[in-house]
Amino acid sequence: MGGTQRPRRGRSGGAPSVADVARLAGVSTQTVSRVSGGARNVRADTREKVLRAMERLGYSPNRAAQALRRGSFRTIGVVTQHIERTGEALTTEGVLAAAWRAGYTVSMIQVERPASEDMRTAVLHLAHQGVDGLVVVQAGRADSRHLVLPADVPVAVSDSALVGYYPSASADQVRGARAAVDHLLGLGHREVHHVTGPQDSQSALIRSATWAARLRESGIEPPEPVQGDWTAASGYAAGERLAADPRVTAVFCANDEAAIGLIRAMHERGRRVPQDVSVVGFDGLSLGEYSFPPLTTVRQDFRRAGEEMVRLVLEQVDSGAAGGERQILIPTELVVRGSTAPRRERT
């Protein structure tokens, strides 16, 4: 007869114990304890046997008691901003996945603004919860002089002014922005305009500074950038402004959403992309594949940034040593699609 198999009882007839799990899995009770505690120094096949035995017996370890015994709740605190934005959401997904694989849970706080005071409040709240480590996904331009992270808690950060002061994992913004500008210059465009990201974003500032520096290296004075805020609406507004200038033939947008908004504005005002205006975005979001035309962009691996930050935190947890100022730069990749083309001479 079908149906869900009922959990077995332990030898004494009561709830199953660690010894019952060990007996069924053919391992020691110490191994069962290591698996239930999330330890990583257990062979994959052994872990699988123990987990199957737990499931078959209906065994559930007392997490609170385990935490009290070892002085750790196996929890990573995460501070993020704009979780509704695709990039931050993907990075947070990477954090969650890596933490889960390592046997850790996540306690997350989303701040409304990346101001130092908001960040400080969130960090202190998580530290008081007794988290084993902290991951700061987005701190914007929060000043390291005014935002001091707890010295006794392992920390990793990404894409903020805190990079260089704490262990970090971030996309190589400089190489990515240079690749975007070089691509447009290589197509013969004599000037590359720029739609920025918000001024409280460290990654946006790096992309803008790299754009300007690369143009100057090529003997070109950068035109006045157009302020954006990551949204498609800001890109659309920038596109309306730039479309009115017939001299504009190339635009580097600080992110994909703004680039897609700009492309629509160009089309609506009779400027064809890429025949009249070439457009490059940044991020490599999947929606760029389905824009019209498909968007040339700089792809960054958001999920890997989250995974690397967890790895940096757990290395500090395992070693008991601070991570110093170690920086992991994650490579970016120029993805050439249909929104860029060689510059056409005006007739």
Language model segments and positions:
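Alpha-helical recognition/docking segments in bacterial nutrient-uptake
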Residues: 1-4, 13, 75-182, 186
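Flexible loop/turn connectors
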Residues: 11, 245-347
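Hinge/beta->alpha junction and helix N-cap segments in small-molecule ligand-binding domains
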Residues: 63, 81-90, 108-117, 169-179, ...
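Short beta-strand segments enriched in small/hydrophobic residues
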Residues: 31-34, 68-84, 90, 183, ...
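Short acidic/polar active-site loop segments enriched in Thr and Asp
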Residues: 28, 74, 132, 189-191, ...
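Periplasmic-binding protein-like
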Residues: 128-138, 193-195, 225-226, 246-255, ...
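N-terminal helix-turn-helix DNA-binding module of bacterial transcription factors
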Residues: 1-74, 344
